[in-house]
């Protein structure tokens, strides 16, 4: 994941140097097609199919409606949607979401394993993951605007500078993985998110006369903290689930990541709607606060024992 994250901004900068911005989206079409056929060819079939369990379109539609309404309500405030529509969306989200959760709790093979959230250390790891990925997406979406409006970088320069964040993760994440057996993952996650929060706060209050190096070390600080957090948190989340439920746990891990990323992007839009040009600084400030909350959540896991 870190290598792909490094390649993303660099490739985007290269594409923008020779083509217009629509190509940033068009390039994903052939990549997606190739990935689809590679997945069909090399990924193993789900063993559940052998047990006679079929894909449930009803569950899929309820899942899409629940998360779609949730994200839509968060984003609606940034698009001047009438309050009555927003309230209607919130009520619909509560009703459909409640029905969906109750249905999932009765399923033997649920699409989302809400029953695993009854395990304290598992649920705390999910919360920590959501907070951290929300903060990460707040930062990654807001930073290009900060670099373009405050520091007047072009698209190519912005992409190259943004590479410094994931580049550090490439080196830090494997080291964090090696420390999992020696240091409690809650400590690694707490320290990592604290470091990331320092980087976010430094970017939020960055002076306008800051040069390239000043920007790079702040971004690298964020990447270092996130890299130190991610691997230990993933390990603790997966290992806290029963061995026969690791597949379900990995699904919840991906869901937590996507919820955080989607909410983070929606919050940036909301901040731009509320605060205009100062939104990038406010987004970095909010990201710093969320990472501190995530650090606290991570450290709280020190008092919770792993399930037997």
Give short role names for the model-derived ranges.
Residues 1-2, 103, 133-134:
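A generic secondary-structure micro-motif detector
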Residues 1-58, 243:
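Helix-loop-helix hairpins in multi-pass membrane proteins, especially solute transporters
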Residues 2-17, 42-44, 65-76, 140-144, ...:
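Membrane-embedded alpha-helical segments in integral membrane proteins
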Residues 8, 30, 66-67, 185, ...:
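ATP/adenylate-binding site constellation spanning eukaryotic-like Ser/Thr protein kinases
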Residues 18-19, 27, 35, 84-89, ...:
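12-transmembrane solute porter fold
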Residues 29-48, 64-76, 92-107, 294-302:
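C-terminal membrane-cytosol helix-exit motif in multi-pass small-molecule transporters
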Residues 36-67, 105-120, 181, 244, ...:
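Flexible interhelical linker loops that connect adjacent transmembrane helices
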Residues 47-51, 76-82, 208-209:
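Membrane-interface helix caps and helix-loop-helix hairpins in membrane proteins
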């Amino acid at each position: 994941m870190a290598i792909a994250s490094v390649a993303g901004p660099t490739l985007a900068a290269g594409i923008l140097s020779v083509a217009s911005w629509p190509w940033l989206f068009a390039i994903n079409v052939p990549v997606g097609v190739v990935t689809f056929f590679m997945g069909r060819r090399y990924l193993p079939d789900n063993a559940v199919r052998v047990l006679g369990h079929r894909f449930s379109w009803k569950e899929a539609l309820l899942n899409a409606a629940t998360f779609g309404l949730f994200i839509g309500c968060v984003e609606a405030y940034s698009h001047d949607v009438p309050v009555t529509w927003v309230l209607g969306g919130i009520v619909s989200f509560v009703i459909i979401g409640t029905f969906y959760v109750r249905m999932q709790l009765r399923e033997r093979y649920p699409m989302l394993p809400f029953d695993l959230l009854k395990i304290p250390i598992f649920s705390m790891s999910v919360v920590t993951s959501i907070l951290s990925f929300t903060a990460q997406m707040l930062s990654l979406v807001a930073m290009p605007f900060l670099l373009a409006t405050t520091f007047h970088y072009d698209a190519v320069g912005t992409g190259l500078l943004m590479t410094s964040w994931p580049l550090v993760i490439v080196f830090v994440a494997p080291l964090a993985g090696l420390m999992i057996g020696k240091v409690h993952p809650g400590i690694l996650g707490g320290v990592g998110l604290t470091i990331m929060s320092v980087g976010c706060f430094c970017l939020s209050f960055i002076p306008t006369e800051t040069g390239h190096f000043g920007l790079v070390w702040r971004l690298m600080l964020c990447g270092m903290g996130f890299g130190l957090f991610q691997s230990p948190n993933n390990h603790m989340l997966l290992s806290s689930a029963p061995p026969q439920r690791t597949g379900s746990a990995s699904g919840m891990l991906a869901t937590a990541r996507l919820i955080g990323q989607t909410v983070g992007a929606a919050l940036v839009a909301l901040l731009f709607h509320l605060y205009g040009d100062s939104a990038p600084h406010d987004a970095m400030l909010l990201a710093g606060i969320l990472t501190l909350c995530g650090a606290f959540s991570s450290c709280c896991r020190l008092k919770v024992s792993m399930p037997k």
